[in-house]
């Protein structure tokens, strides 16, 4: 049984790579006009929260049959957390595989926002393009969810954390002691482990509320992570990517230990395909951030996998935190759109692949 399961998943790698190659050729040619029209001598202009909000509303008005836009919550400073859904029946929760893409948990990491927005435009503008039938096929068979800016306050302030006031590491002090929580350390898995293994997980570094990795007084203490939690609990999806920058590598659970998940083989299969498309290094088992950096406690990936069973990845895009070259940014967007299309197609078989993997 295990041999048969392994063969099925290895076949998924080969098939996935073929899909990726087929998608990439028309995709790159379809947007070549966009890239050539950019003035490469001028720095790339990243979308602010207000610019993103305006563009999302404009796209929703123009493509209302394929795109819905809703706020899943408010930040401490009152900004909406926008969620985009793409589907051929966008107002209906269908029994179709879902995928989720998120960006900007860290407010000073902006390329992921551009990747998500570019993908939204690409899907909408090419939905009726007869030379790109895979776009219509994906819209017909997949429910695509995007939260392109998880941390609007942090993006606006250009800071890693959000902007909520802290009252000491446990939230007990009467006065404000610092500002901001690292949202990708605020999920409830395995948030409390640092207290059991303080040296392994560098508790003295992550406990002070002024630390750039401060994880909040308790799990899901922040408006932003609460919103993601409530949204994901109400929707089904098989695969997710959370974008960060930078490093050009791919990470998957477990994020805090070298111990493998029950779906290690499937995580590797999908991850290897992502790597084939974008050329990034897939961190597996002992390549992980353990024990060199103590691992990542409270990440969205761990929580999404444990709570939803989703194959949840972090993709660290690019080799600089905020590239200024328009060509570099467009290349990131182009490549990751190909990744997105592959994942939407692979999502069609993920549950059956899981069943095959766990046959006894």
Question: Residue ranges of each PLM-predicted region?
Answer:
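Secretory targeting signatures
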Residues: 1-34
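Short glycine- and acidic-rich boundary segments immediately preceding or forming the N-terminal edge
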Residues: 31-80
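C-terminal accessory segments enriched in acidic
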Residues: 41-45, 197-360
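Extracytoplasmic/secreted envelope proteins and their assembly/folding machinery
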Residues: 49, 53-56, 60, 116-120, ...
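Surface-exposed patches in mature extracellular/periplasmic domains of secreted proteins
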Residues: 66-73, 129-136, 283-288
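Proline/glycine-enriched tight loop/beta-turn segments at coil->beta junctions
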Residues: 79, 90-98
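Active-site/substrate-binding loop(s) of hydrolase catalytic cores
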Residues: 95-102, 110-260, 314
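Conserved phosphate/anionic-ligand binding catalytic regions in large, soluble enzymes, centered on
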Residues: 106
């Amino acid at each position: 049984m295990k041999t048969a399961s392994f063969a099925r998943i290895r076949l998924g790698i080969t098939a996935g790579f073929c899909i990726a190659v087929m998608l990439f050729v028309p995709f790159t040619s379809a947007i070549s006009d966009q890239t050539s029209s950019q003035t490469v001598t001028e720095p790339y202009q990243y979308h602010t929260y207000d610019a993103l909000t305006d563009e999302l509303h404009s796209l929703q008005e123009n493509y209302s049959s394929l795109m819905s836009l809703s706020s899943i919550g408010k930040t401490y400073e009152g900004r909406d957390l926008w969620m985009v859904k793409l589907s051929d029946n966008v107002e209906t929760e269908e029994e179709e595989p879902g995928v989720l893409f998120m960006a900007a948990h860290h407010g000073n990491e902006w390329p992921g926002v551009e990747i998500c927005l570019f993908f939204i435009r690409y899907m909408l503008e090419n939905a009726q393009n007869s030379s790109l039938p895979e776009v219509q096929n994906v819209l017909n068979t997949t429910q695509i969810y995007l939260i392109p800016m998880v941390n609007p306050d942090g993006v606006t302030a250009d800071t890693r954390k959000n902007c909520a006031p802290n009252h000491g590491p446990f939230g007990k002090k009467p006065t404000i002691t610092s500002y901001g929580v690292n949202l990708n350390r605020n999920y409830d898995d395995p948030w409390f482990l640092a207290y059991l293994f303080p040296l392994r997980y560098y508790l003295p570094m992550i406990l002070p509320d002024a630390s750039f990795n401060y994880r909040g007084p308790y799990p899901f203490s922040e408006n932003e992570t609460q919103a993601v939690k409530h949204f994901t609990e109400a929707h089904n999806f098989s695969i997710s990517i959370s974008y960060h920058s930078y490093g050009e590598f791919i990470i998957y659970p477990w994020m805090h230990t070298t111990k493998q998940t029950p779906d290690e083989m499937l995580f590797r299969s999908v991850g290897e395909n992502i790597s084939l498309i974008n050329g990034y290094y897939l961190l597996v088992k002992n390549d992980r951030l353990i024990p060199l950096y103590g691992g990542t406690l409270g990440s969205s990936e761990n929580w999404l996998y444990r709570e939803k069973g989703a194959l949840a990845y972090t993709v660290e895009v690019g080799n600089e935190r905020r590239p200024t070259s328009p060509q570099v940014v467009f290349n990131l967007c182009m490549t990751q759109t190909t990744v997105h299309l592959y994942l939407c197609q692979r999502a069609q078989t993920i549950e059956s692949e899981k069943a095959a993997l766990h046959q006894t």
